[in-house]
From Swiss-Prot:
Lineage: Archaea, Methanobacteriati, Methanobacteriota, Stenosarchaea group, Methanomicrobia
Family: Belongs to the class-II aminoacyl-tRNA synthetase family.
Subcellular location as annotated: Cytoplasm
Enzymatic reactions: tRNA(His) + L-histidine + ATP = L-histidyl-tRNA(His) + AMP + diphosphate + H(+)
GO terms assigned for molecular function: ATP binding; histidine-tRNA ligase activity
Enzyme type, top EC level: ligase
SUPFAM superfamilies: Class II aaRS ABD-related, Class II aaRS and biotin synthetases
Superkingdom per UniProt: Archaea
Cellular component annotations (GO), alphabetically ordered: cytoplasm
Identification of the protein by name: Histidine--tRNA ligase
Biological process per Gene Ontology, one example term: histidyl-tRNA aminoacylation
Major location (coarse): cytoplasm
Amino acid sequence: MIQKPRGTRDFLPAEMAQRRFVEQKMRAVAATFGYGEIVTPMFEELELFTIKSGEGIINEMYAFEDKGGRKITLRPEITAAVLRAYVNEAQMAPKPLRWFYFAECFRYERPQKGRYRQFWQFGSELIGADSAAADAEVISLAYELLRCTGVRFVMKVGHLAPMKHLLSGLDAPSQKQVMAALDKRDMDLLGTTLASLDSSDLFEPLKGLVTAKTLPEIFAVTGDIPEKARIEETFGYLEAQNIPFEQNFGIARGLDYYTGMVFEGFADNLGAENQILGGGVYRLAHLFGGKDVPSCGFGIGFDRVLVSLGEITPQTIPVVAVICTPETRIPAYNAASALRSAGITAVMDLLDRGFGAQLSSALKSGASFAVVIGEKEAAAGMITLKDLATAVQTEMSIDNAIEVIHGSCR
């Protein structure tokens, strides 16, 4: 028996209904912020992703040579592809550009709960706006996207300027060692790492960044850095919009990727692997042949959000089983067409079973109503509507049946 590839999944209709339910909620929120959808190719030139991250990332990607000898990869993330599309297609468009995406990505990594080799991201990119208001808008959008799903989460917001200020005396490899320790929130490891770099004097200031609860505490450590006003303004805008967040100036990922504000989101119930959101301010367009442009964006791990949510009950439209005999199939087709035109799901029996078997099948399928058309109903141009929850049935016209079915949803 041929099995699906490791790290992938099949989604049957019930699960797809749940996924689409959450996806549509998120799409609706993005639209209210004025963001339009962008779609990029599922595969891109390999260089698009190695130009910033280096050749080492190849081991994490589905990379290959095509028949023309071109180095291609299935996309491991979306941001680089969106900025490539911007450089190719939209550099002259009026700014700022507000784009969102919902797309599948591929990474060759060890599958585990909530992490797969084929996975979906929902995210946005705001291109061409460099201001505290822009930073706050993107964070607000990320917050509302998560909130609308019903997931329980904590948003953490910081800025890389204080960290970069403290680490400015270290070379790039040393900075990465320190960042690795900070990322693990391991103060013992941080102390050991700094000692090995003859930089133990940085331990207390760095610890202060990680543990500080207020902006005055941060600037007591760093002094009046140039980015102070921008940080205060961004936080002020978030507070004015009643966006709940925790400040975290110890966010250690992406020091060589992000250039300013950074933020993350964590689900309450996913244990150690609980990050479901990551984003910040960056500049990538110039790497892909375009003019330098400020950008800010984020990605949401859609699959991990679904794992956190657990069972979801999508709002469903009524399902009606249309029950007929072989002799009344034509009027049954007409009734089914009328139901579907009214936005009601209508399912017909295809096996020429008796009324009893059809009714039993309808009950097992979860249908809300049955529209029964026997010879008597067909001769009178009527139908019998049966409420499968109460077993009450009434003869009526199909138009009246549609009104009753719609009324049951109110």
